[in-house]
Amino acid sequence: PITVPVGALVRVHVLNMVEYDPVASFHLHAQTFDVFRTGTSTVPGEHTDTVTLTQGERAILEFRLPERGRYMFHPHQHHMADAGAMGWFSAV
């Protein structure tokens, strides 16, 4: 797991570098996040629990985990998740 302090700002840089798939997503369980799409603004354009990126697209996600525990993340493309593209944030 990726360990973070409870309540601390977490910033995740995500990008879709998958050549054989037109889209990839990032979904966070039990928490939502602000989405800063690259090159668009210094103000988040979305607040959600899932972001979908096209090939070559990238974004910065920001959130805080308010409670101790494990928060699962994964793509909604099952073949990517089955190949290991999933994990946990552990808030301590």
Q: What is the predicted function of each stretch?
A:
Residues 1-92:
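Copper-binding active sites and cupredoxin-like electron-transfer domains
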